[in-house]
Amino acid sequence: MDRKKKPLDVTASSLVDLKAELFRKQEEFKQEKLLKDSGVFGKPKTSNKKPSIWSKQNAGVSSRAEKDAEQKLEEQKTLDKSREKLEEKAKLYEKMTKGDFLDEEVEDMYLVDFTQKIIDKRKEMEVLGATRDSRIKEERDAAVAAANDDDDEEEFSEKDIPPPQDPSEEWVDYVDSLGRSRRCMRKDLPSLLEMDKNLQGRLFVSPANEKTLLSEDMRKELQRQQWEEEEREALKKPMGPIHYEDIRENEARQLGVGYFAFARDKELRNKQMKTLEMLREQTTDQRIKRENIKEKRKAILEARLAKLRQKKMKKSKVDGTEEESRADGVVTEPSEPKSVPAPPPVAQSSKVEVIIQERKDSKPGVPHIREWDRGKDFSFGFWSKKQSELRAERDPEFAPPSNYFVGQKRTGSLSSQPWSRPGAAPSDLGHSSGQSQEPSSSHTSTPASESSPQAPTVTFQTLDDMISYYKQVT
């Protein structure tokens, strides 16, 4: 879809200026092209561009640069002067050390005696030269003396040795396995040769090391010769089974500790196998004996443990019967057992059985005292006052709010019911709730009547009486 062209508001003068500028640029381009073709290069164009903000310098930069240049020139001058002064001083010191003074008066101006220093230096040089000459002379004398001693020893060894009285003491020269020339008495020669032979056996080069000194053709030839010898030996032997050692042929693989290299000879191989079988049987027999001994020891130990368990069970049974008799308040004699009639099942439902357990490391009836509590005073008494008396003595200011006791009115029916405990004495039946009582003492002191058909019970008027009673018992 073609869009309509918007009319441009351009004056005639601007169009004429644009056309003139275009014509001028075309003429300039033609002139540059003609100059380039003719080999004449025109002047570079001068760009009248506006300088950017980065090309501008800060104020005072040029003045500071001039000051820095002047300061550097001054520093360079002072450096040159100081260098000249130092060079003059070095030359003067060199002359003084050599003794070249301009005047004796000038020499007295300095604190250092350069003349004495020159004399001392010359003396040191003379001493060093003398010591060096003496050391060189001593070394020469020592070398000459050593040479004379060697000559004397040779002359003594060759001329002054007396002739041997016995032929076995005659000195003999021989060459050992390492190619060294040796001298010894004739009587020591056999032992030395034997030692040399042993040493040569130790220094035997293995075939693996010899291979590195051979070429490939020589190695193949040696392998072929070895194979031919083995085949000849195999042809001489009778036909039989082939073993691993027959085909191993210098195998480089290490087969471990459990591998045993049997001999290739049949008789020797059978002998080795019999020996190994005998050793295996001895090992199995010893292992079986050791296992039997372990089983016997284990059986003896189990028997001992069973006896100990039986003894502990007997002791626990006896202790259990004694504890039951203490809980019931009756001391039974094991020699004269008496049959006690069992209570009816209806009475058991309303009884509470109490089992008193005491420590075995303490006496019955006596509380256990720890090691760190011995010698201390303790009171093992019971509360002598009831809860009602304690509440009466309490200051009403510290009493709890009255609404806490609203829900306790329902417990009246429970408190009216009598509480009973088996095994109590009949003397405890008539005690009232308002009096302080000790039912545990009466319970343990008064035995149960044998003629009664069932065990007497203890009745409690209130819940507090029952709780205090069980606190005293336990």
Curated annotation (Swiss-Prot):
It is found in: Nucleus. Residues 64-86, 129-142, 316-327, 356-372 have a biased composition (Basic and acidic residues). The gene is Ccdc174. Residues 430-453 have a biased composition (Low complexity). Disulfide bonds: none annotated. The keyword Nucleus applies. It comes from Rattus norvegicus. Its main location: nucleus. The modification Phosphoserine is found at residue 206. Probably involved in neuronal development. This is Coiled-coil domain-containing protein 174.
